[in-house]
Swiss-Prot record:
It is found in: Secreted. Involved in dorsal-ventral patterning, permitting peak BMP signaling by antagonizing the residual anti-BMP activity of the cleavage products of chrd. Functions to promote the formation of ventral mesoderm by increasing the activity of bmp7 and other BMPS. Seems to antagonize BMP signaling by forming ternary complexes with chrd and BMPs, thereby preventing BMPs from binding to their receptors. In addition to the anti-BMP function, also has pro-BMP activity, partly mediated by cleavage and degradation of chrd, which releases BMPs from ternary complexes. One of its GO terms (biological process) is regulation of BMP signaling pathway. GO terms for cellular component: extracellular space. Pfam families: Tsg (PF04668), Tsg_N (PF23782). Keywords: Developmental protein, Glycoprotein, Secreted, Signal. Residues 1-25 form the signal peptide. It comes from Xenopus laevis (African clawed frog). Transmembrane segments: none annotated. This is Twisted gastrulation protein homolog 1-B. The gene is twsg1-b.
Length: 218
């Protein structure tokens, strides 16, 4: 009697091999869900490095906006060295179209027993980062002008505080957006290690650039 063998789909084998690679080869926190979907659908099976790019377009369409960050996870582009720029130092931000300031304030007042961490800091801390960025961009766009300065009034902002909420656990960027919308936030910041930050109505910029999700710090 011939021994029976367990037939494992090629997509599953590829997924396993990708996930055991060193971290500098693939941003697992950012890409896991979408890469799994594309591999299961067998849309990223070809190998451009071997001269076969028959599936490249389909794979790119499947990964969508995550193509730039995740193409190395499916062997479509050269691996990146994420040790130089850890996921916690990168983030995606977006304004939410229909914020509900009163709801956000009500949910973040006082101590809560929910699975999130409320952080409040002066708005001027946001403005200092924002001014540095604007000044740098104006200098790049107008190199012929020297001593470019950005004038921002701090008189009113000094009394204002920016309140943000960090969810304890890691989540996808879609879940981050939905969760922040459901609590009335004005904006959200999703760190590329999957930490989610909801930004309150008093914040001028996009909240804090520091990861503070208690169960999602790496």
């Amino acid at each position: 009697m011939k021994p029976s063998f367990l037939h494992i789909p090629a997509a599953a084998l590829l997924l396993c091999s990708l996930w055991i690679l060193p971290i500098h080869c693939c941003n697992k926190a950012l890409c896991a869900s979408d890469v799994s979907k594309c591999l299961i659908q067998e849309l990223c099976q070809c190998r451009p490095t071997d001269g076969n790019c028959s599936c490249c377009k389909e794979c790119m369409l499947c990964l969508g906006t995550l193509w730039d960050e995740c193409c190395d996870c499916v062997g479509m582009c050269n691996p990146r060295n994420y040790s130089d720029t850890p996921p916690t130092s990168k983030s995606t931000v977006e304004e939410l179209h229909e914020p509900i300031p009163s709801l956000f304030r009500a949910l973040t007042e006082g101590d809560t027993q929910l699975n999130w961490n409320i952080v409040t800091f002066p708005v001027v801390e946001e403005l200092s980062h924002h001014e540095n960025l604007v000044s740098f961009l104006e200098t790049v766009n107008q190199p012929q002008q020297q001593n470019v300065s950005v004038q921002v009034s701090h008189s009113n902002e000094k009394e204002h505080m920016c309140t943000v909420v960090y969810f304890d656990d890691c989540m996808s960027i879609h879940q981050c957006k939905v969760s922040c919308e459901s609590m009335g936030a004005s904006k959200y910041r999703w760190f590329h290690n999957a930490c989610c930050e909801c930004v309150g109505p008093e914040c001028i910029d996009y909240g804090s650039k520091t990861v503070k999700c208690v169960n999602c710090m790496v």
